[in-house]
Amino acid sequence: MRFISFLTFVIILFTSGVAMAERLSVSSKIANIRSGPGTDHEILWKVESYYPIVVLKKSGAWINFRDFEGDEGWIHRSLVHKKATVITIKNTCNVRKGPGTNHDVLFTVEKGIPFLIMDRQKNWIQIKHADGDRGWIHKSLVW
């Protein structure tokens, strides 16, 4: 009886789980986002370093993805890496000197600015922009 209970538990565990989507980020200074898998497809928009994406599928050397706004596009796999990044999702975000609202604001950024994750402390993320600016941001302000 214990074996059947255990087997049932294992089957439920492995068949009901949701697969985690692979998350990547842009590694080049600027990357073209295209409408399909190839340079013959239209450029939809351009993104900068550390722009995070969620992989939907792969086709040869091309990756179909979704971004923080739900937009989909294609990017060549040579232009991405697995570094952990975030992007701001609020219109105005304070970047602080330390992990907490008791720390001074170093600068503010608008929605859609990508950052490399350097460290985490509870609900705070230490970030670095491609231009070298660093600071701390609350996790509720990023995707």
Segments (PLM) and residue ranges:
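SH3-family beta-barrel domains
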Residues: 19-35, 45-49, 54-97, 104-132, ...
